[in-house]
Amino acid sequence: MAISRLIPLAVLAAVFAGPALAEEFDLDALIKAAQAEEGINVVDSTGKIVDMAESFSKKYGVKAVGTKSKATAQLEAVVREAQSGNVQGDVVMISDVPAAMGQLMPEGFAISWVPPDLAGDIDPKAQNPLLVVSSPNVLTYNTQLYKECPIKNLWDLTDPEWKGKLAMQDPLGKPSYTDWFNQMRSHADDKIAAAYEAKFGKKLETDTPSATEAFVAALAANGPLLTDSDSAAADAVAANGQTEPFVGLVSAAKFRDNAEGKLTLGLCSDVDPFIGFLNSTVGLIVKGTNSPNAAKLFIHYAMTAEGIAPQGEDGKVSSNRTVQLPADEPSGISKHLGEVLAYDPSTGMDDWDNRQDWQDIWRLSYKR
């Protein structure tokens, strides 16, 4: 069957397309072309993708099926399907930006596309590749045990007082944490050094090449409680009946459990130099899709307030600066976005290349 194609996917095949340039763009023409194509499969690591796909289908009359799949499984599937010529996933939303940049894009297995009509609203740093949404991972405390966050400086987490009392996912199994370490070194090492001086009243003296490496080594040496999930970390901090004074580093999405009475999480604020970091999700069109226009239309939809709304409920932040979080989002992170370290994909390949080094630093420094 002949397939109407507004713009062949091959035209988009620059490995890193860069921020969208001003160009003629006709959304109505894209919709019409998408409606003439086969349906699409869209994959994300959150179950909210099911709701997004259903709403997209109703809005545009283009069939879309959403599937939840972990980032590692998505990466493997894209490579396998591209090599076999049997593409099943048309759009992938991967919450491991460095891996997507390191494994998929250089080989041309998947392509980043920024909707030209929305480019002016999207943070320029989030366009190469396109970061659709970001999940805040933030310092938390138990509001039943503390009137306010007991942490005022990231270096507080290295104090004997907090030995074994920080709950977080294991960096050896959660790449977003080693990426955070590398992002700090690449973009905020001076702030880490300044925070040390602010806390201890003297400049940091270290044999390590950077302040961030000194911080990570000290943090690991203080024996955080390492978990295999956000849920386990959040429970350690603020589950009902918890009497141990833990603090945690968890996803803002866990604050949903406050409303259900399962947790009593509080959001830390005014921590020097930041309260956490953003873990971003990249949106890519898979090479070989039979429905390139439908795939592009879904990317466009995901970059609108209507399209990303289901994920906004979990505190996930759109890269479209005109899109606001819901007023009733449980964590209250919208008031503190300036206090988190945003992900900068300009050093994404460096994050990818240095994961093993950061894991080695953590492994060699960790003491329980």
Predicted regions: what they are:
Residues M1-P8:
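Bacterial N-terminal signal peptides that target proteins for export
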Residues A17-A22:
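Sec/Tat signal peptide C-region and signal peptidase I cleavage site
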Residues F25, E339-R368:
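Conserved C-terminal helix/tail region of periplasmic/extracytoplasmic solute-binding proteins
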Residues D26-Q35, S45-K63:
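Short, polar/charged alpha-helical segment
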Residues V43-E54, T67-V79, V87-A238:
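Extracytoplasmic ligand-binding site segments that recognize negatively charged/polar headgroups
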Residues P98-Q103, A238, T243-G266:
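A ligand-binding cleft/hinge motif common to bilobed small-molecule-binding domains
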Residues D121-I122, S134-N137, E213-L219, G261-K287:
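Periplasmic-binding protein-like
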Residues T281-T347:
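Mature extracytoplasmic/periplasmic domains
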